[in-house]
Amino acid sequence: NSDVNTDPEGVYINGVSRDITFRNCKVYNIKSTCLAGHNNGDWRSAHAFLVIGDDNGTPIRNLTIEKCEIYDIHTGTSETLTIAGNVDGFTIQDCEVHDVENIGIIVAGGDNLNAGGDISVNYARNGVVRRNRVYRCSHQVSKDFWEGVYNNPAAYGAIGIYVCGGASTVIEQNIVWECDRAIGLISESDVLATKDCIVRNNFVYNNYRTGIYLGDYIGYTIGGTSGCYVVNNTLYHNNLVGGALNGSNNSANINDEKDSEGEIRLAENCTNNTIMNNLI
């Protein structure tokens, strides 16, 4: 779809859905190709999978996405596989997610997608993201959009696997490479922390910026990261370009070593997290 302010989806699930399995599917060529930035209020968005628990009383439960290949998705500022809002119990495993222009897999709060939802349940939780291969989730896939229309020449902001205001999710045994960032436990919310998650036994390598990232969406939100564990992961040869430590709209000087993010990055509002036994 080339129209502004539209949101093409490959698969859309909402309401009180439950007991759904997607297995051995291919989802590809879902694209928003409009050349709209945010300067005038227009936007570009698409999803391969969009799961929104938008009922305050009953969550979406028992959702499984496994052995699927998801690729060639132009999401704009949205995500490729999105689990958000009142979702309680899900598994994403043995999938391959690659060659997409922004975030690969996200487990999120419903602040934006389910605005007005009950804050006590408006976040995805009790999930497992396991044994997936996630690669080339990068703004470099669509430099014409990110560098041209979005006017951000140092845009390396896409994350392979991302918990953003979600909770109680295990991320394990995944391989993530050639993404802008590999794994994020971050919050783009002022009211929902990313909390009580476990990142373990993953291999992340050759990513443009940091391998594993915790804390606020720097300079924008204060939800933070709490009660999470980052253990027994292997991180190799990440941080290939400079980071965004100055918080200036991801527009770091990519040649400035002082602006480097490193293999593991902690931003503001990281509380009661444990990082141990990682091989770097």
Residue ranges and their predicted role:
Residues 71:
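Active-site lining segments of carbohydrate-active enzymes
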Residues 1, 8, 12, 16-17, ...:
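Parallel beta-helix/beta-solenoid
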Residues 125, 134-139, 164-177, 205:
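Leucine-rich repeat
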Residues 196, 204, 227-229, 235-240, ...:
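Outer-membrane beta-barrel pore domains
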Residues 3-14, 35-56, 74-84, 101-124, ...:
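Extracellular beta-strand/beta-solenoid scaffold signature
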